[in-house]
Amino acid sequence: LDRIERALKEIQAGSPVTRGTLQTTFQSKAYDELRRLGLTEESERIARSSFPGQTGMLVVDQVIPGSAAADVLAPGDILLRIDGELVSQFVPLASILDGKVGEEIDIELERGGRRIVSQVRVDDLHAITPDEYLEFGDAIVNRLSYQQARHYNRAAEGIYVANPGYLLSKSAIPRGAVIVEMDGEPVRNLDDFEAALDTLSDGERALVRYVTMEDPQSSIVRLLEMDRTWYPARRCALDDSTGFWPCRNLAEGPPPEPPAVGSTRLKKYANPTVNAIAPSLVIVTFDLPYTLSGVSDRHYYGTGLIVDKERGYVLVDRNTVPIAIGDVTVTFAGSLEVKGKIEQLHPLHNFAIVSYDPKSIGTTPVKQATFNTEPLEPGDDVWVVGIKSDHQLLHQKSTVSSVDPLLLPLSRTLRFRDSNIEGISLVNAPNEVDGVLVDKKGRVAATWSSFMLQSGGDAAQLNRGVGSEVVTQFVETVRKGRPFYSLEAEFVYSPLFAARKMGVDEEWIARLEENNPTRRRALSITRLVAGSEASRLLETGDVVLAIDGTVVTSFRELEAAVQKPEVVVTVWRNDQVREIPIKTAALDGRGIDRAVSWAGALLQDPHRAMAAQRGVDPYGVYVAYFSYGSPATRYGLWAGRRVVEVNETPIPDLQAFIDATKDIKHRESVRLKTMAWNGTVEVITLKLDNQYWPAYEVRRTEAGWRRTDFGS
C-alpha cells in the first residue's frame, strides 16, 4: 500500500499526485535466470550484499515503441541503478519515477554482460492516460491509453474506439479499433481528430485508416460519413475538482455541398428476359440510428425495384427498410450511389417505397418496371432476378410450387409482422437474394421479398413471392396520397367443411363455393387490433361472409372491398348471420415521426404492431430501448413496457409525457406507473441524471429530422 498511502497524503494536502513512467514494463526475475541473461558476478554480489533478503532483480519485459525509453531500453535489460541508486524492487522504482516527471534520469543497465549507462526522460503517466473523450454520431472515442498501447505494442497515440455507436458501425469500424489517419493526415490525439471532424459537413465522407488488436501490423481503410443530424458532436473532459465530465460542442462544420450529379452505364445480358428487368433493379441500403418500434438491428440492404421513374420511387421490402426513421442510399449498377429518403411504409404489408432525386443520376438509363397482375399459379414458370450483396445480378429460372397463406409467428420484440397475405413458394428457390419474379417478357409478376420472423429467441428471414397486384395498388395509393383503409382484423382461411361445423347454413356455403369453386374456403377472424372499432364490434371466430353484400373468400378480395371509410360486414356468429356496419381505420404510411430519450430510455407512442399482435391498447408511451448504465437501467424502466402515469398524472401519449416531465430537475425522483404487454402493472421510482442522460426529442419536420433538447 506504499504508493496508495503516498497518493492519499498528497490528496489530503491538496497537492497533485504525480505519476512517472518510462512506458516500460519490468519483471522481477530470480538470480538464476538473471545469470543466464548476462548478469555479471560483480553486479550480483553488490545486489545480494545490498539487499540480502531479496532473491532477484528487475528486468525489462516490454518497451512501448515511440516512447522516450525506446531508444535506450530493450527487453532482457537488467536494471542496476537510477541516478546512482541501486534499484531492485518495484516500490523504489515507482518512487523515483513519480518524483522525476518530465526530468532526465541516469539509468544503468546490464545487457548480455555489457554495462550500459544512459539518460532517459521520465514521462507523465497522467498525460498518456485518457481524461477526456469525444462523442460524435453515437460513437465514443478517446486517445489510445498507455495500458491499451501495451496490448497493441505500439506508441500511445492514435484514437481508440471505445464504442462504435451508429456512425462508426455504419462504416464497419469495430469496437477496439485504433484510428491512425483521416484523409491521409496522421491522427495522434483528440486535438488532431477534432480538427479533422470540424472540416466535415453533414453527410460528407472521409477516408479513415485504422488498426485492430487482432492484426496490429496491417491497417484497414474505411469510408466514414459524418453525421450531424441524429447525434451531437461534443468533447468531454474530466474536471478533477468536481468529478464531473463537462462537455462542449464541436464546431458545426461547413454547410453541406449540393449533391453531385453522376451517371453510369448499365450492363447488357444475353438473356432477353433478364435484360428487360435489369435496368429497373437497384440496391437499397438503410441505416437505423435509433432502436424503435421493435427494430434493433442497425444496418440493412436489399434489392429495390424502380416503380416510378419520374418521381424516383423505388419499392423495397420491410426487411430492407423496416421503419420510417433512418438514412437511405440507392446504388445503380454497382457504380453510382445517391442519397434516398423514405416516402411511405405499407402499414399492412411487407413493402416500403423510398425515393431518389432523378436529377442526381444524370443520364443513367434506368427503366420503370412493368407489371403482369395475373395471379401466379402452381406450375407457372418464372425467372427470379435480384442483386446480391456484392452488387452482382443473380438470375435463375424457377417454377411456382405453391401459393399459400403466409402465417408468420408473432414478433418477440413487437416489430412489424405481415398478415392477411398469400406467399408464393418456388421450386429450388434462391434464399440468398431478394428481388422480383418476372415472366418471359420481363414483366414483374411478383416480388421475391424477404420477411423477418422471430420464433422464441431466434431471428431469421424467409423469402416468399407476393403478387404484383398488391404492389400496383400500393404504388397507386402513394402516388395519389390516399390513406390505406383497414378492417383492423387478422384472418385465416377455413375450409368449407370447418365452416359447416361452425354452423354456416347451406345457402351461404353454396354462395362461398360459387365465389371460389377451386379453393372452397371462408375467412375466419383470428385476431383483432386493440382500440379499433372492429375490436368492439367483431369477435375472434367470426366467419366473414361478405362486405357490402359482396361475397369475399380471399385476403385480396376482402382488402380491396374495405378501401372505403365505412363498410357493412356480414359475419356468421353463434348460428346466425349478422350484418355489422363498421368504420374502417384510415392508416397512413408515414410510420413513426417522433421519439424521446429520457433518463436513458427511448420512448415513443405505441406503434400499430403492439395493438395488432398482442392486443395492447394504444395508450401511454412505449419504452423501445434503454441504455446500459442509465437511470432507466438502474431503476428498472425496461424495454417493452408502457408508461401510463407520471407522479399520478395520466399519460395518454408522448406529448403528455413531455409536458409532465420537462420541469423535473436533476437528481429529483419521479414515480412511474408502467404496464407490461400482458397488463401487469408495476410502479417504480426513478431518480433523474440530467448531467449524463439529458432529455431530447427527435422529430420529423418538413425540412427533415431534427433533434432538440428539453427538460431542466
Language model feature labels by segment:
Residues 2, 14, 388-391, 453-457:
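Catalytic-center loop of serine/cysteine hydrolases
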Residues 2-8, 395-403, 456-475:
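Conserved, short, structured surface segments that act as functional micro-motifs
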Residues 3-289, 296-331, 335-347, 352-366, ...:
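C-terminal recognition in membrane/secretory proteostasis and scaffolding
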Residues 143, 382-416, 605-610:
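Chymotrypsin/trypsin-fold serine protease catalytic domain
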Residues 375, 389, 393, 430-431, ...:
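Short capping loops/turns at secondary-structure boundaries
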